[in-house]
């Protein structure tokens, strides 16, 4: 790629670019912007999400057994002090837990829920900040 100056000095700059593709496992799918289009989450699997300006991302977890589950998330942004709101809802859209994840906080518990086999919990992630990434995970409570 060559960039040239528009001035009379006739400068030219030569640049080489290399594009490397990196596949991210368990990346959210768009459009997961509502309960009806929520991405399905499996137990003990880390999921990656990309938060965009005025974005809302939904996930759903269906309990494989009757037990308590803990939902954790991390805001992976380290440079901009962006925040992310995380909320857990049941089928009736009743809020079970809610918290804010700030840049640099590390993994944080969103909530602990007792679910029967087949019951669902919805996770809503939202932000009014610019683009950044986050991760989430559901585990059984020991």
Summary of predicted features, one role per range:
Residues 18-43:
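Predominantly extracellular/luminal regions of secreted and cell-surface proteins
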């Amino acid at each position: 790629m060559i960039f040239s100056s528009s001035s009379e000095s006739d400068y030219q700059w030569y640049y080489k670019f290399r594009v490397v593709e990196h596949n991210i496992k368990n990346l959210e799918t768009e459009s997961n912007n509502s309960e009806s289009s929520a991405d399905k989450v499996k137990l003990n699997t880390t999921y990656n999400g990309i938060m965009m300006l005025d974005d809302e991302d939904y996930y759903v977890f269906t309990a494989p057994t009757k037990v308590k589950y803990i939902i954790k998330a991390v805001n992976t942004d380290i440079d901009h002090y962006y925040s992310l709101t995380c909320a857990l809802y049941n089928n009736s859209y009743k809020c079970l837990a809610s918290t804010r994840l700030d840049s640099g906080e590390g993994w944080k518990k969103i909530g602990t829920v007792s679910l029967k086999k087949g019951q669902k919990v919805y996770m809503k992630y939202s932000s009014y900040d610019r683009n950044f990434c986050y991760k989430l995970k559901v585990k059984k409570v020991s």
